[in-house]
Amino acid sequence: MIFPPSPPTLGVEWEVALADPHSRDLVPRGHEVIEKATTHLEREFLANTVELVTSVCTTVPEAIEELREGIEEVKAIAADMGLKVWAAGSHPFSDFRKQPVNEKGHYNEIIERTQYWGNQMLIWGIHVHVGISSKDRVWPIINAMLTYYPHLLALTASSPGWDGIDTGYASNRTMLYQQLPTAGLPYQFQSWDEWEAYMADQNKSGVINHTGSMHFDIRPTRYGTVEVRICDSTNLRELSAAVALTHCLIVDLERKLDRGEELPTLQDWHVAENKWRAARYGMDAEIIISRDTDEAWVTDELRSLVERLSPLARELGCYDELQGVLTICQTGASYQRQRAIYKETGSWLPVVDAVLAEM
């Protein structure tokens, strides 16, 4: 893989879906929105989905403003079609068996290969790209970012419902997506050469021929970025906080390397446990924070991160967005709001209404 060095620029991909405000079910008309929009939109795996894609941005506010303008256009087009826009990690009752995949050879091949699990990918996420100055820094930074996996997932967890039930998870999307053979946690490679050898193996074995790429939760890209794919899709306010935290964390890690500091890491088994805890318990997760298996509440860790990173956030122009992390800690994440409504009403319909209203 070619990896061109990049300054710490930023790009964001935001997956959203179309919903019928009467039935509250999903509607496979994403291609119609894309055809009418001037905003940069991409087709995604599902025909009900559109993906908003920013340009290469220098600051979080710049990226968020592009997304704000884009989502307003998408909402207006959807409204003309009698539809609304859905932004969450999954849908609480839409039948994945009845939601068609986009007609694209790559996607159809994934379905053919993965069968039952591939058909269940009724999920949406947020992908954040941050530029990295050297390919030799990519894997130290990715391995360090894995220590912050539960922080980012808990903030955005928005998929408690699935197939008509409360799963008990904050992010059922996370549990579903890892069922695909090329998805899930990356291996903690120790060098760029080791990564290239791994990718050569995947090419030789035909894995990449079937899937187009590896779909790790954090991965390098040919654009000179590290792509963080941890977060559930959610509303723009909570997305802004997660993007700001991601940008600050990666820039902070780059600067630690500049100073010759060793970056934090966790054992693979701790990383996997933290991922599960955040998916299960969200903002109520107790997470592992050291190689000695010390633990802390994810909300306490988030507050500490905001305090530590706030000076850097001012420098990067995303101080206000980073403070949104504290708001989520105080008022709750999307999955908590959804679950509270479901427990109160016993129905997913008002839950869908509430999520649609947040857009």
From Swiss-Prot:
It catalyses: L-cysteine + L-glutamate + ATP = gamma-L-glutamyl-L-cysteine + ADP + phosphate + H(+). Pfam families: GCS2. Its EC number is 6.3.2.2. Gene3D superfamilies: 3.30.590.20. Belongs to the glutamate--cysteine ligase type 2 family. YbdK subfamily. One of its GO terms (molecular function) is ATP binding. The keyword Ligase applies. Keywords: ATP-binding, Ligase, Nucleotide-binding. SUPFAM superfamilies: Glutamine synthetase/guanido kinase (SSF55931). ATP-dependent carboxylate-amine ligase which exhibits weak glutamate--cysteine ligase activity. One of its GO terms (biological process) is modified amino acid biosynthetic process. This is Putative glutamate--cysteine ligase 2. It comes from Corynebacterium diphtheriae (strain ATCC 700971 / NCTC 13129 / Biotype gravis). It comes from the Bacteria. InterPro entries: GCL_type2/YbdK_subfam, GCS2, Gln_synth/guanido_kin_cat_dom, YbdK.
